[in-house]
UniProtKB/Swiss-Prot annotation:
InterPro entries associated with the record: Hemolysin-typ_Ca-bd_CS, Hemolysn_Ca-bd, MetalloPept_cat_dom_sf, Pept_M10_metallopeptidase, Pept_M10B, Peptidase_M10B_C, Peptidase_Metallo, Serralysin-like
SMART domains reported in the protein's UniProt record: ZnMc
Key words of the record: Calcium, Hydrolase, Metal-binding, Metalloprotease, Protease, Repeat, Secreted, Signal, Zinc
Cofactor(s) required, per the database record: Ca(2+); Zn(2+)
Protein name (record): Metallopeptidase AprA
Protein species of origin: Pseudomonas marginalis
Sequence positions that bind Ca(2+) 3: G345, G347, D349, G362, A364, D367
PANTHER family linked to this entry: MATRIX METALLOPROTEINASE, MATRIX METALLOPROTEINASE-21
Family per similarity comment: Belongs to the peptidase M10B family.
GO aspect biological process, one term: proteolysis
Gene that encodes it: aprA
Annotated Gene3D superfamilies: Collagenase (Catalytic Domain), Serralysin-like metalloprotease, C-terminal
Lineage: Bacteria, Pseudomonadati, Pseudomonadota, Gammaproteobacteria, Pseudomonadales
Length: 477
């Protein structure tokens, strides 16, 4: 084994642009405290979840089996008295597509909470019905009743279908009809709108929102565009809508009925090569539009966005948001969820790990990769890649990160977030001075190390291993 013989002081003068980009994106979606959005208070996930709930609006577990078992019926007829009671007219049955998509929407709720749905005429802890109407309700596109509204109302949802309004006739992945189904089912389960507003009651706007995150970027129970929170779910001129509950919806429904930890409790891949069995969690083409929040019960899990060519920003931390496949803030991770791995695509990606032992692959492009804590396995892929570290604890001796494809002259190891521009002194052996760094490389194994004594105790408190030799000029400090 040979040691680098260079003795130099390398300084970035300050934290690098790469570190600043990582740091900025990691805090972009911070919530709560004294933060504001558009002059409105910023709510934490827990605060937003509470905002979605209403006192007494929940089903009871009558048989004590630890979950809410609901039955449902697609109505085949409705009397004039029933229609009059709801202020509507022009009944029609759900078509085959509506029925199939309603089942998928219900499944998305049962995935995240202890709720089951069975098509049956009656029974269970509560009963739900679905039907269409052609006029009434002041032109509302759909409406539903929260539990506790009263007999003949609980579990009821209605959908406008006529020659002037057709989205509810053709619900499908990521379209407004599918979101409407999932939204209305959310009401029948006990979730309200995030604010005190309803369609047909005045002309509500985002100005009526109580808090800043009341948008469809955080909750599909919201009326307001994700653009209000600087997110963008449009691609190729087509807007995508969530087909399953989003980050705040998941927290809210779990407050009511508990979390379903049986969902995706094994090793699960989201995005490309998905094994979720859920259309809205899967991608097969660069043209796909993903809008989802990850709920995962356990295992070793992966966000695989390798099939996208756009520049992406991926964050593996719980309650975080990512920019995936040309959209902005379109993928989030629910509170309490750990996702271990992330795969970028062909663009210039920014990827942030968490404190688990992550596997991060940048793919093609000039990527910025930050593994954070844990013994991470890192691949930059083709291109000029920068591996960023923000604390000595990000890669400790005994739990060191390993870069599997380091190419000297193209790739960088960026420690400027630790040194804050103070630089490093490259030596052959530690001298007891803070900032001493030792580079080693063994040609026989093609393995190198970068060890740094940040504390000045004469031993390394930071260590990263490389497959491939790193030179002093490859280190940004």
């Amino acid at each position: 084994m040979s040691k680098a013989k260079d003795k130099a002081i390398v300084s970035a003068a300050q934290a690098s642009t790469a570190y600043s980009q990582i740091d900025s994106f990691s805090h972009l979606y911070d919530r709560g405290g004294n933060l504001t959005i558009n002059g409105k208070p910023s709510y934490t996930v827990d605060q937003a979840a509470t905002q979605l709930l209403r006192d007494g609006a929940a089903y009871r577990d009558f048989d004590g089996n630890g979950k809410i078992d609901l039955t449902y019926t697609f109505l085949t007829s409705a009397s004039s008295s029933t229609m009059n009671k709801h202020g509507i007219s022009g009944f029609s049955q759900f078509n085959a597509q509506q029925k199939a998509q309603a089942a998928l929407a219900m499944q998305s709720w049962s995935d995240v909470a202890n709720v089951t749905f069975t098509e049956k005429a009656s029974g269970g802890d509560g009963h739900m019905t679905f039907g269409n109407y052609s006029s009434g309700q002041d032109g509302a596109a759909a409406f539903a009743y929260l539990p506790g509204t009263g007999a003949g109302y609980d579990g009821t949802s209605w959908y406008l279908t006529n020659n002037s309004y057709t989205p509810n006739k053709t619900p499908d992945l990521n379209n407004y009809g599918r979101q409407t189904l999932t939204h209305e089912i959310g009401h029948t389960l006990g979730l309200a709108h995030p604010g005190d507003y309803n369609a047909g009651e005045g002309a509500p706007t985002y100005n009526d929102a109580t808090y800043g995150q009341d948008t469809r970027g955080y909750s599909l129970m919201s009326y307001w565009s994700e653009s209000n929170t600087n997110q963008n779910f449009s691609k190729g001129g087509v807007e995508a809508y969530a087909s399953g509950p989003l980050i705040d919806d998941i927290a809210a429904i779990q407050k009511l009925y508990g979390a379903n930890y049986n969902t995706r409790a094994g090793d699960t891949t989201y995005g490309f090569n998905s094994n979720t069995g859920r259309d809205f969690l899967s991608a097969t083409s660069n043209a796909d539009k993903l809008v989802f929040s990850v709920w995962d019960g356990g295992g070793n899990d992966t966000l695989d966005f390798s099939g996208f060519t756009q520049n992406q920003k991926i964050n593996l931390n719980e309650a975080s948001f990512s920019d995936v496949g040309g959209l902005v803030g379109n993928v989030s991770i629910a509170k309490g969820v750990t996702i271990e791995n992330a795969f970028g695509g062909a663009g210039n990606d920014l990827i942030i790990g968490n404190n688990a032992a992550n596997v991060i692959k940048g793919g093609a492009g000039n990527d910025l990769i930050y593994g954070a804590g844990g013994a991470d396995q890192l691949w930059g892929g083709a291109g000029n890649d920068t591996f960023v570290f923000g604390a000595s604890s990000d890669s400790k001796p005994g739990a060191a990160d390993k870069i599997f494809d380091f190419t000297s002259g193209s790739d960088k190891i960026d420690l400027s977030g630790i040194t804050k521009g103070a630089g490093l002194t490259f030596v052959n052996a530690f001298t007891g001075h803070a900032g001493d760094a030792v580079l080693t490389y063994a040609a026989g194994t093609n393995l190198g190390t970068l060890a740094v004594d940040f504390s000045g105790h004469g031993v390394a408190d930071f260590l990263v291993t490389t497959v491939g030799q790193a030179a002093v000029s490859d280190i940004v400090a």
